[in-house]
Amino acid sequence: FVSLYGKAIQQNTRVANEQGLLATVRYLPQKKLELSGYLDVFRFPCPTFNSRFDNAKGIEGMLQSLAQIGAGWQLMARYQIRSKQQTYNYKSQVLKEYVMRHKIRLSSLFKATRGDVAVQLDAAYTAKQRGTSSKGIMASCRGSYKASKRVTAKAFMGIFFTDDTDSQLYV
């Protein structure tokens, strides 16, 4: 089922071999301010890519604020947390552990008649139950300029630093 006119609060997810409950909320306290969030409690009845055991459990949540500041200027702040059971190898044993990921995003978007500019800062921190952790940070900027009806120039620039793939970040 896909809602053609629905506004998806949870992004970039694929439900596969999963059971759970997802609750979302969207609140407009003022005309130029939107608050939204979700809470997703889930379990995988069969083994998955990251967990070789049945019944791996997890919880994910997100809070986001979006504010319109003046004509064409928008600010956004987002916090996401996810805790999920995964397996790892220790000597000759396969063990389960909880992996917790925190992600923060701050972004600013300015739109004008002939173009736009967006600046974004992301940070991630991952902690595993066995005591290891990793962190990552990314800064990015993108822009576009419409010179005419047929010609538009676009540019993107980004830099990121991560300890490993556990703290990976996406634009």
Regions from the PLM with identified roles:
Residues 1-171:
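Exposed, low-structure sequence patches enriched in small/polar residues
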